[in-house]
């Protein structure tokens, strides 16, 4: 739970976000999740033609700028296509290797791993929870990053006119998120 301005919000859990299959080009389920989150919390948002999601929370004065957080909505694993079509969740298993804890996605039909850790569902998770935590913030969620940054290349530049800086939450290497749980 998160208390903001005397209101209590249920924070989005990482597990909720990781469970959503979102193969590149088939990201409707995660976009729908983000849109529903915005509606639930009364956040201003819009989608562009590519289905990038742009969110604004709060107001700024004329001489101020918004901070902005950014994440991408797609993953690279083809075995998720069937799960997306059937609107199935990815099973999340926690495994322990000595002192290390690792979250892995599992395909329920094949009982085999799917996904590469938190790329970039951790970014989506962080951005959504920051929208709850801060009074003034913009967030952009780009589609098809894993197949040539198609969403960000066609981003609405006007959304960023009043942005002072942006922070992107994406991992530099395979399984980077799993390594951060040590």
Give each language-model segment a name.
Residues 5, 36, 52, 86, ...:
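Detector for Asparagine
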Residues 6-102:
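Acidic/His- and Gly-rich active-site-bordering loop/insert found
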Residues 16, 20, 108-109, 137:
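Generic, low-specificity signal for short hydrophobic/alpha-helical stretches with a mild N-terminal bias
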Residues 46-49, 69-71, 104-105, 139-141, ...:
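General beta-strand structural signal in soluble alpha/beta enzymes
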Residues 96-115:
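Residues forming anionic-ligand binding surfaces in small-molecule and nucleic-acid pockets
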Residues 110-182:
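Acidic/histidine-rich catalytic neighborhood of metal-dependent amide-processing enzymes
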């Amino acid at each position: 739970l998160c208390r903001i301005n005397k209101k209590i919000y249920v924070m989005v859990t990482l597990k909720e976000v990781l469970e959503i299959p979102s193969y590149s080009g088939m990201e409707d389920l995660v976009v729908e999740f983000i849109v529903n989150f915005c509606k639930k919390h009364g956040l201003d948002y819009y989608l562009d033609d590519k289905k990038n999601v742009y969110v604004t929370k709060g107001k700024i004065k004329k001489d101020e700028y918004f901070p902005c957080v950014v994440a991408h909505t797609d993953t690279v694993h083809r075995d998720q296509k069937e799960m997306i079509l059937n609107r199935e969740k990815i099973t999340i298993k926690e495994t322990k290797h000595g002192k290390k804890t690792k979250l892995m996605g599992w395909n329920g039909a094949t009982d085999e791993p799917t996904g590469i850790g938190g790329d970039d569902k951790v970014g989506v998770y962080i951005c959504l929870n920051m929208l709850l935590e801060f009074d003034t913030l913009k967030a952009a969620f780009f589609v098809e990053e894993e197949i040539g940054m198609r969403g960000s290349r066609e981003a609405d530049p006007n959304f960023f006119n009043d942005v002072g800086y942006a922070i992107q939450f994406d991992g530099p290497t395979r399984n980077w998120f799993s390594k951060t749980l040590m």
